[in-house]
């Protein structure tokens, strides 16, 4: 592949194109991958399509200004993003330990991007070119546009627009607003005076400079000094996060005013088709070949993005604050054309890995009202149950999948991005479910029930546990009829706000009853921009302002995590301590309902648990299970659940992330 098909990354590339100067230089914390799953590729190609000359500086050395000068001063300004993932999440685990690999960097090498990359890069650009326009965007900037709790510093930080010193922030997917910003810059406007565009943020010196209808939020000083005020502030942000009915929000930061304009409308189907038809090279830049390429491309190379936005609104997911609740999708023809293109790749083996998005089986707005009235302000589409106005329909998605799997050269089309199983169960037509199981499962179907405790599910904004039970039973019935050996891999989360040890034990009992042990368990990770993170920081549910239990200590987090893997001998002591701590010694012993054996039996040649932990059955929900999987929990468990439900019935539901856990 010729290097000149990529956008310029050095002066020689500019000379080859006959450019004396770039209009924009885009600085990113990721390696340069020209694929539409990466924001750098989309924004640069959209601007190129609008007639602008864009150069790329990927993973510059931030210890000097030299790399920031290698394409020269751009005519209109610098664009800066922190990569496809918040740099702090990219660097650190939930326990704040440094990760071993960076999949967006050659050789997976750590240390090629700084913490808080957007801020660091902007400071270096200012050092190189003092008065140049700087526009920031991407996931890091989008989710940190307000004063926000930062888990890694364990404090409230200012809006990233203030800390970075940038002139303008574009949030969300940003294709519309970045072109409009570019056009105004091209007309001679300074970036800091471009103030009317939806989906952007700017800084005003006084409230008199703000002409739009707006709401003044509690100031940075107020939210950083009082947790109740922080929660109340988040509730306003949450309610106004809508492109139709949302209003401009204003937050004072030390005498200046961060102005967050209402969100931009999502792209129409025709606009999405044009964006995804731009001349992406669909791979990493050739300069990385000597290092073995970039691992991040492997997950998306044979996958197709079909939609944006999510109606699920899970409390721990940032999609609502980034892509929004209104779902839009590409046309069938656009997706089929991309699938045909993929079949021509030299290394394509006949398998499309995914056709999906934040939620694969969402293709349209939840109801007809959303595009004219916006998403509902005081209720969610799918929690605690599916709204009566939600249009549940898989026909278009099913027709799309059929078209793609019939293409010459395609052996299988898999679905690996999130599927909402409650949406599948709400569809009165079983055709999609049957064809999903028959044609689109690569041996294992990954879904995200996350928990079974009604109390925890309520705070997560997830469907009731019985919905997942119904789904898995139906999945196994269809699988058995087809004569297949397929499994379900449920994603589970420990230590979410509202989750007590009793709730974790309830989940452990459920796993015991279905004879399943997860290989990995995800602790709740408080990331910027989510409802759950606000609960974690404040101990309050912003939607009700009632107190929420937060598992904070390392000891309790370890107990909750170990309970989900109670069959692992390494976890015996901590599971034992957890059960004793809450008076559940009835689960210690030799009975069929016990999670672990007593200490007199453990270590004397006997298995530490009454439940086998080896083999595939312990890692997957086996399609061969019968009635034993579906037995009711012990009477003690039922009593526990009943008590929990009654104790929390006044608390309202929460909303959503993801990274693609649906």
Swiss-Prot record:
Which keywords appear in this protein's UniProt record, sorted alphabetically? 4Fe-4S, Iron, Iron-sulfur, Metal-binding, S-adenosyl-L-methionine
Q: How is the cofactor bound?
A: Binds 1 [4Fe-4S] cluster. The cluster is coordinated with 3 cysteines and an exchangeable S-adenosyl-L-methionine.
* UniProt binding sites for [4Fe-4S] cluster: 310, 314, 317
Which GO molecular function, any one, fits this protein according to its record? iron ion binding
Q: Write down the Pfam families for this protein, in alphabetical order.
A: DUF3362, Radical_SAM, Radical_SAM_N
Q: Where is this region: Disordered?
A: 596-662
List cofactor names only. Answer: [4Fe-4S] cluster
Q: What positions does the domain Radical SAM core occupy?
A: 296-567
Keyword rRNA processing attached:
no
Comp. bias intervals (Basic and acidic residues): 618-632
Q: Locate the compositionally biased regions of type Basic residues.
A: 633-644
InterPro entries, sorted: Elp3/MiaA/NifB-like_rSAM, rSAM, rSAM_horseshoe, UPF0313, UPF0313_C, UPF0313_N
Q: Which family does it belong to?
A: Belongs to the UPF0313 family.
* Name of the molecule in the record: UPF0313 protein CPF_1407
């Amino acid at each position: 592949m010729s290097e000149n098909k990529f956008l310029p990354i050095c002066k020689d590339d500019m000379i080859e194109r006959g450019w004396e100067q770039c209009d924009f230089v885009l600085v990113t914390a990721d390696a340069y991958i020209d694929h539409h799953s990466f924001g750098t590729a989309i924004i640069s190609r959209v601007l190129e399509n609008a007639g602008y000359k864009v150069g790329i500086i990927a993973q510059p050395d931030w210890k000097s200004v030299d790399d920031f000068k290698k394409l020269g001063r751009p005519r209109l300004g610098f664009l800066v993003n922190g990569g496809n993932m918040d740099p702090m999440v990219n660097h650190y685990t939930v326990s704040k330990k440094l990760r071993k690999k960076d999949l967006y960097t050659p050789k997976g090498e750590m240390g090629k991007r700084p913490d808080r990359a957007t801020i660091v890069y902007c400071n270096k650009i200012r050092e190189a070119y003092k008065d140049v326009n700087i526009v920031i965007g991407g996931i890091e900037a989008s989710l940190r546009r307000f004063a926000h709790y930062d888990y890694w510093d364990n404090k409230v930080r200012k809006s990233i627009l203030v800390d970075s010193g940038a002139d303008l922030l574009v949030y969300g997917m940003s294709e519309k607003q970045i072109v409009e910003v570019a056009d105004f810059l091209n007309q001679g406007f300074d970036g800091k005076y471009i103030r009317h565009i939806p989906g952007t943020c700017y800084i005003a010196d006084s409230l008199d400079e703000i002409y739009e209808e707006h709401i003044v939020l509690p100031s940075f000083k107020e939210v950083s000094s009082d947790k109740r005020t922080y929660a109340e502030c988040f509730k306003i942000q949450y309610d106004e996060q809508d492109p139709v009915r949302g209003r401009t929000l204003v937050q004072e930061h030390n005498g200046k005013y961060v102005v967050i304009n209402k969100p931009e409308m999502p792209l129409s189907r025709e606009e999405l088709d044009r964006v995804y038809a731009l001349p992406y090279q669909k791979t990493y830049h050739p300069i990385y070949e000597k290092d073995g390429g970039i691992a991040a491309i492997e997950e998306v190379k044979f996958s197709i993005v079909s939609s944006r936005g999510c109606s699920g609104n899970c409390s721990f997911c940032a999609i609502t604050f980034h892509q929004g609740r209104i779902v839009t999708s590409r046309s069938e023809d656009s997706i089929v054309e991309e699938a045909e293109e993929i079949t021509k790749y030299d290394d394509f083996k006949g398998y499309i890995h995914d056709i999906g998005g934040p939620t694969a089986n969402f293709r349209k707005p939840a109801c007809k009202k959303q595009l004219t009235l916006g998403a509902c302000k005081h209720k969610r589409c799918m929690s605690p149950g599916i709204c009566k106005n939600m249009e549940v329909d898989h026909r278009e998605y099913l027709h799309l999948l059929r078209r793609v799997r019939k293409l010459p050269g395609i052996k299988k089309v898999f679905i690996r991005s999130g599927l909402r199983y409650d949406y599948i169960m709400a569809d009165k037509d079983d055709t999609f479910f049957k064809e999903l199981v028959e044609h689109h499962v690569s041996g294992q179907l990954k879904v995200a029930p996350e928990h079974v405790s009604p109390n925890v599910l309520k705070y997560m904004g997830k469907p009731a546990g019985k919905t997942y039970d119904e789904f898995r039973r139906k999945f196994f019935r269809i699988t058995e009829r087809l004569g297949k050996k397929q499994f379900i891999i449920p994603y589970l989360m420990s230590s979410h706000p509202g989750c007590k040890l009793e709730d974790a034990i309830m989940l452990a009992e459920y796993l015991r009853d279905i004879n399943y042990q997860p290989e990995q368990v995800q602790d709740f990770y408080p990331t910027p921009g989510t409802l759950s993170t606000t609960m974690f920081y404040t101990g309050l549910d912003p939607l009700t302002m009632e107190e929420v239990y937060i598992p904070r200590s390392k000891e309790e987090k370890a107990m909750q995590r170990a309970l989900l893997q109670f069959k692992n001998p390494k976890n015996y002591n901590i599971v034992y301590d957890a059960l004793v701590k809450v008076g559940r010694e009835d689960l210690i012993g030799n009975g069929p309902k016990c999670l672990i054996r007593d200490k007199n039996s453990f270590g004397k040649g006997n298995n530490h648990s009454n439940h086998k932990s080896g083999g595939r059955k312990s890692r997957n929900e086996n399609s061969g299970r019968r009635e034993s999987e579906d037995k009711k929990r012990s009477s003690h468990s039922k009593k526990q659940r009943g008590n929990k439900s009654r104790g929390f019935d006044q608390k309202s539901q929460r909303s959503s992330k993801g990274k693609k856990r649906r």
